[in-house]
Amino acid sequence: MGNSGSKQHTKHNSKKDDHDGDRKKTLDLPPLTKSDTTHSLKSSRSLRSLRSKRSEASLASNVQAQTQPLSRRSSTLGNGNRNHRRSNNAPITPPNNHYLTSHPSSSRRLSSSSRRSSMGNNNNSELPPSMIQMEPKSPILKNSTSMHSTSSFNSYENALTDDDDDRGDDGGESPSMAKVTRINTSSSADRGSKRTPLRRHNSLQPEKGVTGFSSTSSKLRRRSDNTLPASYPLNAEAGGNGSDYFSNRSNSHASSRKSSFGSTGNTAYSTPLHSPALRKMSSRDNDDSGDNVNGRGTSPIPNLNIDKPSPSASSASKREYLSAYPTLAHRDSSSSLSPRGKGQRSSSSSSSSQRIYVSPPSPTGDFVHGSCADGDNGSRTNTMVEMKRKKPVRPVDIDEIIQRLLDAGYAAKRTKNVCLKNSEIIQICHKARELFLAQPALLELSPSVKIVGDVHGQYADLLRLFTKCGFPPMANYLFLGDYVDRGKQSLETILLLLCYKIKYPENFFLLRGNHECANVTRVYGFYDECKRRCNIKIWKTFVDTFNTLPLAAIVTGKIFCVHGGLSPVLNSMDEIRHVSRPTDVPDFGLINDLLWSDPTDSSNEWEDNERGVSFCYNKVAINKFLNKFGFDLVCRAHMVVEDGYEFFNDRSLVTVFSAPNYCGEFDNWGAVMTVSEGLLCSFELLDPLDSTALKQVMKKGRQERKLANR
């Protein structure tokens, strides 16, 4: 499946042989899921797109195929190029049968109309995929009980954003992305099959010719962030001797945990609750927003009930507290989340017709109306009068927000302003924070699930991905991070993902990537986009939300999913489970490694990363990790790969990258890895499209939505 042999393929495999082989072995092809004709029309870079055009003219030519199991002993798949992968369809069955159960597909590929009909009821048969409403699937989150401590709900402010002036005076231009030399890309006429089942063999002995991520293993392999931004703080060890850095790191797990924001908040990445900086930030945010929501929506202090003030507390102290922390004055209760009297549930068992409302974080109760608990009219302050005069903010309807975001995406126009109000964005972020904190830092999921790699603000490609793989809740999703930066529509991208998280909290999951932190977003585009299209407070609100994201996930106890990779200080999964959130990304330690580390074919088990952050780990480290924790596969993102996915170390690790034509510079494909209930791993691909082709695809989707609205 990897590209290790793509350059070693002999010359006797000519293009003529490829085309003849396609015609002769049509019925033996593995299922090629990259056949969504509505989204492959404009690809002129491969013959596979031409076949997609023919298949659109005659859907009867769609073929039936079996999924072929892969084995770590399959030297043909490990060493052959794409044409080998397409023609090799002999199943190889490793001994671990309970993990390798799969059944060949016996049904022909459905047309677009019948596919839509199967996704919903009769009323949805003519709707485009983005508008189909259906019952959510059963929850796949096993450890749904909250695993974090109560102290995680303490008010938290990010010290890295506290000193930012909301007027944006200190925000400079994002530096251009470093140019990267592409590795001798040859124009292959046909890429071959991109959907193959994953079968992990117990043997850890790699086959001859499997070179993993070596310089000859892929036509294009590049880390999505080759260098660390200059503003990213690093310890002295990062730039010093590698052995000294490792010795410092290997025995510093306790300090790593301390850097990950303990409940006391006395770290370099947090501001204490009663700090003057917090008061200053709160008052400054009230003046610059321009919307109806004050503050940043940090989680309220436990046992604080503003609706029922304590008789012993003086009205003056209450008013002083509210003036300093306006966003802490209200917390949604389970019995009053909707103006219609409906309780908002964080469960996927709710029907699709149930409207989900997110209550605003503005203060409510007697204080909003300016009346004090002691009834003293003369004790009203100017702050209370201002709060009384402000127009109340209505709860947002998540379904309506999702449709507005989809309409904006299919409009294919990058506007200066976002389609949502600032107050709506803040409410969405606040609700998402609550959901992230209510779920563990280490998710344990059941199949089936679709695993998505880096998206990087490529909003149109995200809509193409959902169209191909199914809009929620048609499929369960696990995203591996890096939702913002680089792309031109990071705001729409992260907002749509957060809305789906709110709508389907136990079927839609988001992990944290290395770009979901304050320092990186300041350099690579998201800060500038928020400053240009909203304001700096919106960026701060998103950073606070990023600080609550989970760090890793385990699928059915066999597949370890993370954004970056492994860590030399990870000795137990409980160390990830017990990470206290919210937390920024520390300069070193467990969290830093999970988000920044990379695989390497070096002989050293652990060595310094050329990014300047974290480590690189080789095959030995991967095998030790798998054997220690009983996993069969590590699924990660964090690197650009030409085919959208790439295996390493005899299929014990796979990199998934889901942003096709990354930054408009790399002619790479995007991939989504699907894990079936039988632990069969397959890949669905998105072909790289230029801006003109993307606009035509979005135009077609826009026309379908208009017809459905009529």
Swiss-Prot record:
Modification Phosphoserine, positions: S55, S71, S203, S224, S275, S310
InterPro entries listed in its UniProt record: Calcineurin-like_PHP_ApaH, Metallo-depent_PP-like, PP1_catalytic_subunit, PPPtase_PPZ/Ppq1, Ser/Thr-sp_prot-phosphatase, STPPase_N
UniProt biased composition (Polar residues): 62-77, 95-104, 261-273, 291-302
Residue(s) carrying Phosphothreonine: T161, T271
Gene Ontology cellular component annotations, sorted alphabetically: cytoplasm; nucleus
Cysteines paired by S-S bonds: none
A single MF term (Gene Ontology): metal ion binding
GO BP annotations listed: intracellular sodium ion homeostasis
Cofactor remark: Binds 2 manganese ions per subunit.
UniProt superkingdom: Eukaryota
Catalytic reaction(s) noted: O-phospho-L-seryl-[protein] + H2O = L-seryl-[protein] + phosphate; O-phospho-L-threonyl-[protein] + H2O = L-threonyl-[protein] + phosphate
Class in the EC hierarchy, top level: hydrolase
EC number(s) stated in the UniProt entry for this protein: 3.1.3.16
Active-site residue numbers: H515 (proton donor)
Keyword line: Hydrolase, Lipoprotein, Manganese, Metal-binding, Myristate, Phosphoprotein, Protein phosphatase
Organism annotation: Saccharomyces cerevisiae (strain ATCC 204508 / S288c)
Record-linked CDD domains: MPP_PP1_PPKL
Keyword Glycoprotein: no
Necessary cofactors: Mn(2+)
Binding site for Mn(2+) 2: D482, N514, H563, H638
Coiled coil: none
Protein name: Serine/threonine-protein phosphatase PP-Z2
Residue spans of biased composition, Acidic residues class: 160-172
